[in-house]
């Protein structure tokens, strides 16, 4: 197994491609992704969603990992008022999400059947070194699990957790719209290279609602193949962007990076 790493360290992305880095270039803008890697810009102005996800992930990793997470992130605890000493609202919801997962024996059988947690993987895709971390994997039965916290698992436009994707310019289910098919395709390929075996992919999804819904989704190989095609179609350009060989597209007009760096061009003043 590859050496341990800080998966969220942006410097690591200059050495190995990470799914999060790759998706930032596709979904959040090229200029934004480069600035995020350089540490001069944070694509996500609020880290609460990431912290909620990590709160849940650490719980299913081990009791020790969960306690360490809480200790390392005192900001999730209220420091004033009547709620002082209690979890903040978002993390109270996260506890409900955890309990909802634990209440389903089928989900828990799948999770408990994958004993290796936070399993580091690496490999090469078309000559580019990749690295990732699996939430849980069963190496003998050849499947791995990824936990996803989502806004909703209700059907919208006939799609599970359906939402509009600016990148695809259409409604997609939550798995496609967030680029998770790209992430899981890369993980499956790295595992194949490490073990010589084909692994099935399961998503344990839970909604961030006062009454959370939890479910299991087995990802079809056709969906994963689509993710791999998107990697191969975009990877060379992304690598050239990181190496400074290609010029990034201008920051998206709705991004905070654009708003903070935009300057009026006197030769092209807008007309109303």
In which residue ranges do the predicted regions lie?
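Metal-dependent nuclease catalytic cores that hydrolyze phosphodiester bonds in DNA/RNA
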Residues: 1-133
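Short histidine-centered catalytic/ligand-binding loop motif
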Residues: 44-45, 83-86, 159-178, 220-222
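Short acidic alpha-helical/loop segments enriched in Asp/Glu that coordinate divalent cations
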Residues: 70, 154-158, 199-204
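Secondary-structure boundary elements
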Residues: 107-111, 138-146, 191-199
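Short, solvent-exposed loop/turn segments at secondary-structure junctions
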Residues: 122, 150, 208-210
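Coil-to-beta-strand transition motifs
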Residues: 127-131, 138-142, 198, 210-212
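Conserved catalytic cores of phosphodiester-cleaving nucleases, focusing on short active-site segments
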Residues: 132-170
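Metal-dependent nuclease catalytic regions and adjoining charged, substrate-binding loops involved
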Residues: 174-181, 186-272
């Amino acid at each position: 197994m590859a050496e341990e790493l800080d998966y969220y360290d942006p410097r690591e992305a200059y050495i190995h491609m990470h799914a999060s880095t790759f998706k930032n270039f596709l979904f959040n803008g090229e200029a934004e992704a480069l600035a995020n890697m350089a540490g001069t810009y944070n694509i996500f102005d609020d880290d609460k969603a990431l912290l909620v996800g990590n709160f849940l992930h650490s719980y299913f990793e081990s009791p020790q990992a969960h306690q360490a997470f809480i200790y390392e992130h005192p900001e999730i605890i209220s420091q004033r008022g009547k709620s002082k000493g209690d979890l903040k609202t978002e993390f109270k919801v996260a506890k409900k999400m955890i309990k909802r997962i634990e209440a389903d024996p089928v989900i828990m059988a799948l999770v408990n059947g994958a004993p290796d947690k936070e399993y580091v993987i690496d490999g090469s895709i078309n000559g580019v070194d990749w690295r990732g971390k699996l939430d849980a994997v069963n190496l003998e039965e050849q499947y791995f699990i990824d936990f996803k916290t989502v806004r909703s698992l209700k059907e919208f436009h006939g799609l599970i957790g359906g939402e509009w994707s600016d990148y695809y310019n259409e409604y997609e289910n939550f798995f496609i719209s967030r680029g998770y098919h790209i992430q899981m395709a890369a993980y499956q390929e790295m595992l194949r290279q490490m073990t010589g075996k084909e692994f099935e992919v399961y998503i344990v999804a839970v909604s961030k609602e006062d009454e959370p819904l939890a479910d299991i989704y087995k990802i079809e190989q056709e969906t994963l193949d689509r993710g791999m095609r998107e990697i191969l179609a975009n990877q060379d350009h992304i690598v050239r962007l990181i190496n400074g060989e290609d010029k990034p597209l201008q920051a998206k007009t709705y991004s905070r990076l654009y708003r903070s760096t935009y300057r009026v061009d006197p030769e092209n003043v807008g007309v109303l």
